[in-house]
Amino acid sequence: MDAIVIAGGIPRPEDPLYTYSHGDSKALVDVAGKPMIQWVLDALGGAKQVDNVIVIGLSPKSGLTCKKPMHYVSNQGRMLANIVAGVNKSLEFNKKNKYVLIVSSDIPTLKSEMVDWLVDTCMGTKDDLYYGVCPKDVMEARFPGSKRTYTHLKDMDVCGADVNLTHVRMATEHLDMWESLIGSRKSPLKQASIIGFGTLFALFMRRLTLEDAVRRVSDRIGIRGRAIVWPYAEPCMDVDKPHQLELVREDLARQQNELAGKTKRAVKRPVKKTTKAKHIAKAVKKTTTRAKKDVALVAKTKLKAEK
């Protein structure tokens, strides 16, 4: 499966992260010694379920690397247009592709095994769109103080994931609907006019479970949707504010230090011989000793014969 990484966002002066990006792409902001997006590419590169990685909004000049084949597509100016361009690029590689991963470039704590978990979990059914959510307790346990924004449901409080999976036809159907939803994602009232005020009111009153919400929105839009409840917080830990940037910087720096410490201890630790190795060494020693005795005996016998 191909992964489309959205990396075209450039913070404006009024954006909280502008002082960190200095007018460059948000994806290139430094996190523990790497561009933020490089951590995401490392995770995708190590995922068994990823074939190609398509980066939207950057160029080869960015100096990024990935263990999987990586391709660049220029920024199309709008979120939906970027996704459509990424899907079209994926179909260039293989017209039979049915699903793609849509990945944000600002989730640097993502790991390879989490990407594989998502693909394996989603492919148990054949839906149009798989949208991930993380329960509040999972997020707060992993990243206390992250100050995420949660949607309050009847059965749980959740925040949205930034790694999702969609059928490629979603890039060719319902485009007007998607454009409206994405364009109004900061305005609940505008979204309400699209998904229905009844659904929004039920959400506000906490009358909907996660399953109810998915069913209502799917019916309204006319797709088969499925919510994926993440057991991991990392795919939902996107960086939008300075305190979140500092949080992931500290987290990844700590992980690097722990890994370096383990590697250092492993190098210093003497290699213990296994029981089998000990037996072999003992047998070799006996054989060598016996051989030395045999040589000495032959020499002694030869000396007597000469006398």
Language model region names:
Residues 111-218, 230-234:
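Conserved core of the sugar-phosphate nucleotidyltransferase
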Residues 43-50:
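Short, acidic, metal-binding catalytic loop of nucleotide-sugar glycosyltransferases
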Residues 56-62:
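Short, polar loop motifs at secondary-structure junctions
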Residues 241:
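Short, conserved phosphate/pyrophosphate- and ester-handling motifs at nucleotide-, phospho-/glycolipid
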Residues 260-307:
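Intrinsically disordered, polybasic Lys/Arg-rich low-complexity tracts
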